[in-house]
Amino acid sequence: MRPQLIKFTPGYDIKPFDCEDADLNGFLLETDSSIPNAHHHALELLAVTYLIEDMDAEETIAYFSVLNDKIEREITDSTAWNRLSRKQPNIKRRSSHPSVKVGRLAVSKKYQGQQWGRQILAFLKEWFTNDNKTGCRYITVDALKTAQGFYESCDFKVLVTPEENDETVLMYYDLKQYVTR
């Protein structure tokens, strides 16, 4: 196996991929308009998608997309907001905190259970703290409720308690804890 990280660009020939989730597959491979959402997001500068491909097997192992985000006081539980704000000097407290969002993260069925998702999150923690590429303090994710336990095992915390009928839960990881570990 020769895994390689590749920045997706429109027109790139994506190797076969199936994570058994139609929405996550569709983001990368197809939509009703026949243009993948990853393609649209790249053209409109909304998100950047990265592929991890096995160059020997010529298949996509996993992919993830990242985009700029912010944690806003108005949408955050007061307890969570206070927990975030206490970690910063008073002079730097504000009504929002800069973050980078993991817009999508999917691992091919063949590679699930082999720590690829965990490795991607570890890579992102390192990537956004090494030379501080975007000036973000947090990584956020709208995690599917079925994936909440996975993100918690990677030290993400719930930012907003979801309603019973919500499909996702807003979670965050404080990059400062990665820097100081």
PLM segments and residue spans:
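Conserved acyl-donor/pantetheine-binding loop and adjacent beta-alpha core of acyl/acetyltransferases
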Residues: 63-104
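Conserved acetyl-CoA-binding loop-helix of GNAT-fold acetyltransferases
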Residues: 113-127
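Conserved GNAT acetyl-CoA-binding A-motif
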Residues: 121, 128-143
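Conserved catalytic-core motifs of GNAT/GCN5-like acyltransferases
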Residues: 140, 152-171
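Conserved N-terminal entry element of GNAT/NAT acetyltransferase domains
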Residues: 1-20
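A short, internal acetyl-CoA/4′-phosphopantetheine-binding micro-motif in the GNAT/acyltransferase core
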Residues: 103-113
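Short, basic/aromatic recognition patches
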Residues: 24-47
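Conserved beta-hairpin
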Residues: 45-65, 78
